Amino acid sequence: MEALGIIVEYNPLHNGHLYHLEESIKLTKCQYVVAVMSGNFVQRGEPAIVDKWKRAEMALKAGVDLVIELPVVYATSTAENFAYGAVKLLDSLKVIDCIAFGSEEGDLEKLSKIADILLEEPPDYKRALKENLGKGLTFAKARELALVKVTGDESISKTLQTSNNILGIEYLKALKKIKSSIVPFTIKRRGALYTSLKLEGEFASATSIRKAIEEKGIKAVKNYVPDFTLKILERAFKEGQGPVYLQDFSPIILYLLRSGHPLENIFDVAEGIDNKIYKAASMTNNIKDLIKLTKSKRYTESRIRHILLHLLLKIDKKLFKEFDGPNYIRVLGFSEKGKTILKEIKKKTELPIITKVAQYKSKIEDSRMFERDLFATDVYTLAYKNFAISKLDFFHPIIKL
């Protein structure tokens, strides 16, 4: 049994994702595909445009055999934590032979070399990093310049400018850190950059697709997503279950901030950023403006989004300190082929497999992380136009194809 692991968000699944999946299967020659996928909230620090079950359905229709949820505490964290949680989860299945990820670089050796330095932190790198931080540079910029200095490779600066390269490096770092036997592969990304806002070419970015849906409606993206994605999105929107955006939670987040809800224990809050956020919350009535008022060279838009989302979802620093990766396997969906690999996982894994949510307390020794997932769904459904009920995790069926 040859099994390929992929780490995805499919927010939503578009032509570029389909290309990555098909090329990954060709390159690795694997029989089975297991996807670890973000749930209802994603790594950008935002809600997914439609819920995790609809996106799991997209994954299965694209050719994935088994979809497993990445816990929300990892799915909404930094690139490093996101990658570590996802890789640790794939490794814990005990059936994954390969992992394939997209990157703008397309050069596994170069990405691996960077990952080695970041993981091992040799003395010359640490000195350069400390020196750069002392100059008041952001951590990302200080790290970039330190890597250039110790390698003598100026092109590393360009490599670290794109999100898929950064995630790829973090995947490799995580594999090395846990001494995984999973073999990595990378597929060179085609089409628009992840952050591109323009709908153009055969492969538009997920960011531009979400923006087009928000501004022009679903029909505007029909050439950039597979037919099955379009149909799933149309069905969801017709039923009042999407599209969901961060601004849909503006009243709740602003209520928490204006009522003085403490921020100091929220992950990634430091250096007085909480005071800046409180001040901005008193000057606006929506999240978009709050982020504009708060962001700066030091406090990026991404960081502010993550802080606000963690406030909304009650994710604090303690969860990261007390857990070393996901401690359960939550199944969102599987195909006929997926049944076979799920049986194999059941034989080999040491983690509890959750297929019936009502049984989670008897299966998971420390259920705090899982309970964040349940709470995240309850919060997410507040943005629905219809059927905005709680406890959806308890009765929504697993997606089967």
From Swiss-Prot:
Pfam families: HIGH_NTase1 (PF05636). One of its GO terms (cellular component) is cytoplasm. It comes from the Bacteria. Keywords: ATP-binding, Cytoplasm, Ligase, Nucleotide-binding, RNA-binding, tRNA processing, tRNA-binding. GO terms for biological process: tRNA modification. It is found in: Cytoplasm. Its main location: cytoplasm. It is an enzyme of class 6 (ligase). Its EC number is 6.3.4.-. The keyword Repeat does not apply. It catalyses: cytidine(34) in elongator tRNA(Met) + acetate + ATP = N(4)-acetylcytidine(34) in elongator tRNA(Met) + AMP + diphosphate. One of its GO terms (molecular function) is ATP binding. Belongs to the TmcAL family. Catalyzes the formation of N(4)-acetylcytidine (ac(4)C) at the wobble position of elongator tRNA(Met), using acetate and ATP as substrates. First activates an acetate ion to form acetyladenylate (Ac-AMP) and then transfers the acetyl group to tRNA to form ac(4)C34. This is tRNA(Met) cytidine acetate ligase.
